[in-house]
Design a protein with these regions (language model features):
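N-terminal glycine-rich anion-binding loops that anchor highly charged ligand groups
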Residues: 40-46
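Intrinsically disordered, low-complexity repeat regions of secreted/extracellular protein precursors
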Residues: 195-196, 201, 206
Length: 210
């Protein structure tokens, strides 16, 4: 059973997070979903993950699974075809304006800005897809490998220094998302308090009028 804090209930009211054919998104309490993001249907967002402005995650033909401490950055699109799930592991960074369609992204990967990854492709653990690259259908990207180009091809191993830098990036987004979430919840609490005070005042004024 899904349990959502008030913040997510507000997003439901705005219809940005909504069910499809009776299946509602399952969003971890510690995750952050920006109010402008659209999350539909069979979508799971793991603990301390973040979904940023204008992202669309549309789980209307199958499951979209986003692991823990993963960031889906601004304007990215997540979708799939029937029978081809979309799975994103833990500690994955998905850059701005990325398209992920029915693919598998293993843990600790970095997907560069504007990359496109198509049905059946698998990105191995710790791999990097360079900005603007196209990973073709059913392609296999080896673990800890940098690929780039159209179509994307292996260029070299990911260095330990790069891996450490990417891990810092993951930590940065987890911390930033927590700040965004706290501010959103504070704003919502302030609005709720103001609405309650306004309602109480209306009741008092009505009583005086009698």
């Amino acid at each position: 059973m899904n349990v959502y804090p008030r913040f997510f209930i507000v997003l439901y009211k705005l219809k940005m997070i909504r069910s499809f054919r009776g299946i509602a998104p399952n969003i971890a309490v510690s995750a952050y979903v920006d109010p402008s993001a659209v999350v539909i249907g069979d979508v799971t967002v793991g603990a301390h993950s973040s979904v940023w402005p204008n992202v669309t995650a549309r789980g209307d033909t199958g499951p979209i699974r986003i692991g823990a401490e993963t960031s889906i950055q601004d304007n990215s699109v997540l979708h799939l075809d029937e029978g081809i799930p979309l799975t994103i592991g833990d500690r994955v960074t998905v850059g701005h304006s990325v398209v992920l369609h029915g693919c598998t992204i293993e843990d600790d990967c970095l997907i560069g800005i504007g990359a496109i990854i198509l049905n059946g492709a698998r990105i191995g653990k710790g791999a990097v897809v360079a900005a603007g690259s196209l990973v073709a259908e059913n392609a296999e990207v080896p673990a800890a490998t940098l690929v780039m180009g159209v179509p994307a091809k292996p260029k070299r191993p990911v260095t330990p220094e790069e891996q450490a830098r990417f891990a810092e990036g993951v930590k940065h987004y987890v911390e930033k998302a927590a700040v965004y979430k706290a501010e959103a919840q504070q704003a919502e609490a302030s609005q709720a308090a103001a609405e309650k005070a306004e309602a109480s005042q209306a009741v008092a004024e009505k009583a005086e009028a009698r």
